[in-house]
């Protein structure tokens, strides 16, 4: 029988970034503090030790098995009076209670009902939603109060809906068991199948688990007053189609007490996200191995102590930082639950609603631009223009930093010079945190940020992939921002932004440069080698006066040309930065040695194949 609840307005509270930090697949050694500005001394924190082997990154066979036996399953037909055909479940008016392990096929519609799973702690329950429509006025539509694990399977060809009310609270449970989602589980929760599920989390979250939340298939449309998908211990997604609109975080894992939990791992799926706060927020690690992720609106895109991008396609439009690696003690906001903990790795290697972002700003428009591999056109750049879509990119091969089996790299980036600064790079920032890391091993990544494009309070490692950043136009942020070192050993990068706090890489086995060059939204930005052959290009999404470039074809000590709207700037690429500092001074000399600027009204490179990164 459904417990009665007192009605209480359930308004979303301002989200604070709480972070503990873990490192996915990294060993444990401290990161050297880089040089800092003479007027501001860098401080660096040391985190706790962890072992990636302790993290459960896998999917069980049962997670991925959406099959069921229709003949032996108990059939539940919803309505004003529910009907149960089989054992293990009972009906009380419109409400249904499941008390035994087994498979239950749920169909029909109920305007005020709850499906309650209350089983023994070792029971596994499979709920097959086959055109089920459940709305509950005083609690979750589906509430797994107790079980070992619950599997929610979306039957082939089915269309399902679950919704809760705008406000409710429990009166006969302690607060620790209060359900906080339209589909809520106290136990591990797995969703699979090929059908569709629409979730309206009118009170708080859309889909939530106090343990693991695993999704291996299905099509999901989630609207939530707070978070869209939340798995306290972890969120793991193998496949699916997702449209998530949330007032706070779209996808979140919030365990800040266990160094092996609190992570998000995405292995596939097609994602469209509109979030009032973070698109993906993990207390420890965020890992993207595959999938097509489009974040149309957010405050910050990917946020965790450590962010690993190993593949897939990422497109993020953010009103603050697009990617942010920060621990609890170094993130920009905290709440009472913040323990301020952090974890080490081996470096060898605000309420919102409507269309406003977390900072109250209208989200920037999705930029248009080319995103292709380094060009293979003829040396005179005469091949025809083959523009691509905004967020797609040509196929590429990761030459360095490839991680076997799509696991995070074992801190394989190259360490930076202790006084690495601007080529235009920066040494160490204030509040540097050695536990924080952004590591890019593959994939196609396009970022449009009003704040920093990538902000790591620790290190940044680019080992492969294609990275395009349309950074800030304000002087207080940069396309790249890091606290200790930034290294590049592979991949392709074009990062455009303002020069006020600009940083480039601190070192790498692949040559790079920061170039002082200005352009406007819509301008074609082209990198040419000494023979005039285009090696990379992109169409700017917004104004900029600084560019950081690096491709697999660039060599240390070799001269290149950056062409912006017919204006050419020559520069020399290097594998090391040339001066220390906080990164607040703009491009460094090595990144643009005695640049020779010229105006060329006939930009032949505009006729070459599109490409950047």
PLM feature spans:
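A composition-driven surface/loop motif
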Residues: 2-613
């Amino acid at each position: 029988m459904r417990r009665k609840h007192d009605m209480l307005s359930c308004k979303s509270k301002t989200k604070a970034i709480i972070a503990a930090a873990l490192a996915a697949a990294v060993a444990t050694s401290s990161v050297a503090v880089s040089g800092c500005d003479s007027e501001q001394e860098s401080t660096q924190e040391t985190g706790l030790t962890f072992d990636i082997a302790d993290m459960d990154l896998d999917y069980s066979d049962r997670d991925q098995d959406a099959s069921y036996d229709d003949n032996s399953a108990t059939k539940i037909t919803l309505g004003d009076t529910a009907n149960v055909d089989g054992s293990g479940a009972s009906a009380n008016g419109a409400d249904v209670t499941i008390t035994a392990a087994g498979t239950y096929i749920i169909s029909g519609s109920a305007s005020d009902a709850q499906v309650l799973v209350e089983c023994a702690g070792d029971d596994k329950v499979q709920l097959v939603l086959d055109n089920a429509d459940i709305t509950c006025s005083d609690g979750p539509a589906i509430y797994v109060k107790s079980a070992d694990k619950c599997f929610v399977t979306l039957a082939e060809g089915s269309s399902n809906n679950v919704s809760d009310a705008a406000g409710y609270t429990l009166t006969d449970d302690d607060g620790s068991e209060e359900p906080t989602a339209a589909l809520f589980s106290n136990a591990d929760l797995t969703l699979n199948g090929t059908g569709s599920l629409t979730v309206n989390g009118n009170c708080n979250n859309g889909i939530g688990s106090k343990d693991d939340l695993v999704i291996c298939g299905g099509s999901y449309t989630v609207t939530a007053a707070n978070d869209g998908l939340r798995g306290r211990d972890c969120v793991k997604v193998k496949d699916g189609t997702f449209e998530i609109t949330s007032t706070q975080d779209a996808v979140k894992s919030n365990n800040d007490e266990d160094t092996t939990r609190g992570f998000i791992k995405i292995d596939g799926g097609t994602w469209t996200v509109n979030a009032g706060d973070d698109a993906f927020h993990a207390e420890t690690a965020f890992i993207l191995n595959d999938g097509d992720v489009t974040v149309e609106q957010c405050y910050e895109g990917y946020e965790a102590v450590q962010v690993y991008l190993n593949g897939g396609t990422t497109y993020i439009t953010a009103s603050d930082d697009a990617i942010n690696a920060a621990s609890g003690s170094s993130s920009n906001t905290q709440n009472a639950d913040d323990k301020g903990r952090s974890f080490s790795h081996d470096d060898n290697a605000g309420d919102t609603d409507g269309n406003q972002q977390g900072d109250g700003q209208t989200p920037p428009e999705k930029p248009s631009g080319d995103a292709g591999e380094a060009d293979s056109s003829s040396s005179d750049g005469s091949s025809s223009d083959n523009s691509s879509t905004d967020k797609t990119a040509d196929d590429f091969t990761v030459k360095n930093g490839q991680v076997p089996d799509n696991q995070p790299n074992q801190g394989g980036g190259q360490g930076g010079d202790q006084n690495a600064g601007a080529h235009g790079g920066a040494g160490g920032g204030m509040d540097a945190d050695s536990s924080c890391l952004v590591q890019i091993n593959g994939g196609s990544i396009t970022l449009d940020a009003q704040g920093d494009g990538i902000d790591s309070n620790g290190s940044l490692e680019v080992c492969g992939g294609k990275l395009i950043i349309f950074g800030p136009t304000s002087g207080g942020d940069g396309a790249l921002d890091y606290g200790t070192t930034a290294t590049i050993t592979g991949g392709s990068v074009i990062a455009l932004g303002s020069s006020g706090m600009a940083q480039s890489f601190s070192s790498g086995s692949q040559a790079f440069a920061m170039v002082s060059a200005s352009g406007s939204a819509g301008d074609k930005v082209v990198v040419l080698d000494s023979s005039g052959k285009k090696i990379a290009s992109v169409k700017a999404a917004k104004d900029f006066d600084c560019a950081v470039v690096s491709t697999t074809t660039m060599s240390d000590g070799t001269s290149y040309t950056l062409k912006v709207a017919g204006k050419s700037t020559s520069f020399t690429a290097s594998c090391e930065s040339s001066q220390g500092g906080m990164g607040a001074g703009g491009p460094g000399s090595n990144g643009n040695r005695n640049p020779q600027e010229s105006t060329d009204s006939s930009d032949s490179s505009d006729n070459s194949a599109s490409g950047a990164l």
